[in-house]
Amino acid sequence: MIIDAHVHLYPPEIGRDPRGWAAAAGEPQWAALCTRIRRAGQPVQTFPTVEELLRAMDAAGVARAVLLGWYWEKLENCVAQNRFYAACVRAHPDRLAAFAALQPCAGHWPVLEEMHRARDGGLIGLGELSPHSQGYRVDDAVFAEVLTLAADWKMPVNLHVTDPAGRAYPGRVETPLADFGSLARTFPQTQFILAHWGGLLPLVDANANSATLPNVFYDTAASPLIYDSGIWPRALPLIGADRVLFGSDFPLNLYPKQDASPNMARFIAEARSGGADASVLGGNVARLLRLKSDAD
């Protein structure tokens, strides 16, 4: 069973006019990242409906997807996406699971109240969060409360990570790798998923391995835009296949030179060619999130 552990989806009002919505909603960083047009004239991503997502999954042989919230600058936009995700999961419980967006800058009570509402609505994790993009410190007191409660509730936390050696692009924010090792050590009961191969943290820090950071997993979101296909045989043995979660970053177009729109199947083929086995392609995230398999 293939599970895409890193998918974004947006309410219809965003998809109808992404740039206009971002301007009105106060989300300039999201606009820079998600509404940009590439030099060749292609949008960096599309804005599919939930039905279009399900059709794309069917075409690629993806059984389930984990919807990740965005690291919004405004809590009200987190709330709107969380309610939308709750509705998506209710409508398609056999195909979709979802994580909650949060903005700790909004303060103790608003954030914890939203976290409770999200859990009550069926959301099973937190993220994608980005302290460096959202404007709070990794040692922020509200963020610490969020991570502690996430551990109590067994809700994994997905964090956006940028490779310090990666290329520049509009909207890029630096995310010092040392911060993520520090978080994992400070909150050992919290399960962390570091997005985008975790900026290759285990490859640059000998102390960041599965033995020293047993609560850390890594997803592969946007991999073809960041690394060549050699990243799979290079990173899998060093990180450990049991710690890697296949994630695409759909609806980002990962192969703009070959495809006019997102192509999940091409990325799955790349992963398999690079050595991704059934655990990477779905088994690991199914166990982490306690998702039922086809055999259950």
Task: Please place each PLM-identified region on the residue numbering.
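Conserved, mostly hydrophobic/aromatic
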Residues: 6, 57, 85, 118, ...
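Short aromatic-enriched loop/helix-cap "lid" or pocket-rim segments at secondary-structure transitions
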Residues: 13-19, 79, 111-112, 170-172, ...
